[in-house]
Regions:
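Conserved CoA-thioester-binding segment of acyl-CoA-metabolizing enzymes
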Residues: 2-65
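Charged catalytic carboxylate motif
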Residues: 39-43, 95, 102, 199, ...
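Glycine- (often His-adjacent) and acidic-residue-rich active-site loop
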Residues: 64-99, 118, 264
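C-terminal alpha-helix plus adjacent terminal tail
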Residues: 1-19, 173-178, 198, 202-205, ...
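Terminal peptide-recognition signature
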Residues: 25, 29, 43-44, 62, ...
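Crotonase-fold acyl-CoA enzyme core
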Residues: 101-212
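A general structural signal for well-ordered alpha-helical segments in protein cores
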Residues: 96, 153, 162-165, 215-218, ...
Length: 279
């Protein structure tokens, strides 16, 4: 029997497909490595809400079109239209935070299918999913501090522990292989190149066959254990810290965005990388 399929576009930025009882949500800016601008994040939130409200959907897969899961939040768009001060930054960062955490809070199980880069906000988005599958091309990292930005969704300590989290965040590492990510507990499984989506879909179909009320209540209990340990309060504190950082405006971030405006994002990244080259 062939699977039931229904494909819709939320916009050109987010694709939504139903395969049997699974919603497959795809970030869809492949020409920009699925960099997440504010329009995409709004549609991503709407896609998550759509899956939550649809009784036919019992599991969700999140992936990226083309050669990347996502390069993270859109720095080119930020350079072209930079918020000023805490009051302008607060709603932007809250939208970023909510879009990522919607996959953590969804009552239905969520599975990330990662290939290529999953950096900064996209790394955080992949962590927010219940299960993360990565193919052998996947690269993870949190490079924000290297260009003067803070961490929007500081899930990393809860996934890999304080020592690894501090190393990754404070050094701004952005070259963590799938193998390294698996060893530190950042992802669940590594699969051959190009098999991440098929594997994630297979897992999601298995999850969809479990009683939906049982699944929702058990996921809620699992999430509650982290809340009792203080995760939600810690995440809110980190979000407020990032809001203050961006509102204040770090000199490195100002320089990075200026180079991005004048010479392009690639030149800005080259300049950023030069700051932390080995002596």
């Amino acid at each position: 029997m062939l699977p039931y399929r229904q494909t819709d576009k939320m916009t050109e930025l987010v694709l939504y497909e139903q395969i049997d009882a699974v919603a497959v949500i795809s970030l869809n800016r492949p020409e920009r490595l699925n960099a997440m601008d504010q329009a995409m994040l709004k549609e991503l939130n709407q896609a998550a809400e759509r899956a939550e409200q649809d009784d036919r959907i019992r599991a969700v897969v999140l992936t990226g079109a083309g050669n990347a899961f996502s390069s993270g939040f859109d720095l080119k768009a930020q350079a072209e239209n930079t918020p000023q001060g805490v009051n302008e930054w607060r709603p932007v960062l809250k939208r970023n935070f909510d879009a990522c955490m919607s996959f953590w809070h969804l009552a239905k199980p969520t599975v990330a299918a990662v290939h290529g880069p999953a950096l900064a906000g996209a790394c955080e988005l992949s962590m927010a999913c219940d299960i993360t599958i990565a193919d052998e091309t996947a690269i993870f990292g949190e490079p924000e501090l290297r260009f003067g930005a803070g961490i929007v969704v500081m899930l990393l300590p809860w996934m890999v522990g304080p020592k690894r989290a501090k190393e990754i965040i404070l050094l701004g590492l952005d070259d963590i292989s799938a193998r390294e990510a698996k060893e530190m507990g950042l992802i669940n499984r590594i699969v051959p190149k190009g098999e991440d989506l098929n594997t994630a879909l297979s897992i999601a179909k298995k999850l969809s066959r479990i009683d939906s009320s049982l699944m929702a209540q058990t996921k809620q209990a699992l999430n509650r254990s982290y809340a009792i340990m203080g995760m939600e309060e810690a995440l809110e504190f980190a979000l407020e810290t990032d809001t203050q950082i961006e509102g204040e405006g770090m000199p490195t971030k100002a320089k990075f965005l200026q180079i991005a405006r004048d010479q392009g994002l690639r030149a800005a990244i080259t300049w950023r990388d030069s700051l932390t080259e080995d002596d």
